[in-house]
């Protein structure tokens, strides 16, 4: 009989995954393996989404297996767009299940919110390492939610920017962000003000219509587009999507789930894993967009790191 699975809370996960920077090296390997097809040993179907139309939400199921890691996980994630700003329940909630791949036994049930925030930010940092213009000085973050914090953390660890700007739909949340994070961040009153002249832009909003327009973006800038994870949602306008060199985490997922890609008709140039492998170039001299939908193999890497760390210290 298998032993009882361990439960790792958000605090436990945070203890064993203190920085997104810990994920960068293993995630680069996982991205390269994913983009290697069957030879990479990653089995990852596109996420299954169950709409909950009555309550304006959905449930997503994201399984993955990696032969290189010999790890098997699935993440259950919910998103409810009408949550109140004063609600104690976040708009996104996630739980990750880690299995023993040799026999299917459940090893751990762990909070997935910290994992999602940190692995997403780490992948954005990987994309930025390859795609940002040389001598980037200005970082702009659009949005002030959980992902804004995790991105700020890893970006200020991995890169040096002379100026960091933030814009958020509600100024109060931008002020909270500025008063919470270390370092100096300038609040901007409009998206246009925030992005003008920025070298690296991160969009982590709940927008369903474009908020970032190509005419505002500095030629050669790099954009990490994190929000708009449904086929009818967008953060970026047609002009930006079509003028930029477009990179994605998964081409299959982007062509099924990304409104930014589908509604603009933009052509995907490469998966990020292909750039990591060196089989596709990083056009850092051009305007680039990395459209991140998030992948189950990323959750798997983070969950295994957390579980291995917990196991070694128990």
Swiss-Prot record:
It comes from the Eukaryota. NADPH binds at residues 91-92, 119, 144, 146-147, 168-170, 173, 205-206, 292. SUPFAM superfamilies: NAD(P)-binding Rossmann-fold domains (SSF51735). Disulfide bonds: none annotated. One of its GO terms (cellular component) is cytoplasm. It catalyses: L-pipecolate + NAD(+) = Delta(1)-piperideine-2-carboxylate + NADH + H(+); L-pipecolate + NADP(+) = Delta(1)-piperideine-2-carboxylate + NADPH + H(+); L-proline + NADP(+) = 1-pyrroline-2-carboxylate + NADPH + H(+); L-proline + NAD(+) = 1-pyrroline-2-carboxylate + NADH + H(+). This is Ketimine reductase mu-crystallin. It comes from Bos taurus (Bovine). The gene is CRYM.
